[in-house]
Design a protein with these regions (language model features):
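Noncatalytic modules at the cell exterior or secretory-pathway interfaces
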Residues: 80-94
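Beta-strand elements of well-folded, non-transmembrane domains
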Residues: 37, 52, 104-106
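Extended, low-complexity, turn-rich repeat/linker tracts enriched in Gly/Pro/Ser/Thr and Asp/Glu
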Residues: 37-45, 94-98
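Short, surface-exposed secondary-structure edge patches
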Residues: 63, 79-80
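Short, surface-exposed beta-strand/strand-loop-strand elements in extracellular ectodomains
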Residues: 40-63
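Exposed aromatic-hydrophobic patches
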Residues: 71-79
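C-terminal interaction-tip segments
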Residues: 1-28, 32, 91-108
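Short proline/glycine- and polar residue-rich coil/turn motifs
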Residues: 64-72
């Protein structure tokens, strides 16, 4: 089994979209998940969902308000495991306001 520690940024839009997807032969452990409001004048909420392929979906946060120029650690030191074909989905109140930073371990 190979282990790769990596990360990515994701621009959250007003349409629900996967910011991270576990491949068919992958297990992903999300070890860091921050969302930031980068807009200069407008507060915005964000919803973060864990979509389980063949399991029970869950929300990490539902319409959590992020003030202008502020950020939130969605995991508070915890971890989330994505099994094959699971996704980490995001949607925001306003376009071009919320950015996510995701750090994770991929095991194949």
């Amino acid at each position: 089994m190979a282990d790769v520690l990596t990360g990515k940024g994701f621009l959250v839009t007003t349409s629900l979209a996967a910011g991270l997807t576990a491949g068919a032969s992958e297990i992903i452990t999300v070890i860091g998940l921050s969302v930031a409001n980068v807009h200069a004048t407008v507060d915005s909420w964000v919803t973060v969902d864990v979509n389980r392929d063949g399991g029970v979906d869950s929300e990490l946060g539902h319409q959590v308000n992020i003030p202008v120029n502020d950020s939130l650690d969605m995991l508070n030191g915890g971890k989330i495991v994505l099994n094959n074909s699971d996704t980490l989905d995001f949607i925001a109140e306003n376009a071009s306001s919320i950015e996510a930073s995701i750090s994770y371990l991929v095991q194949t």
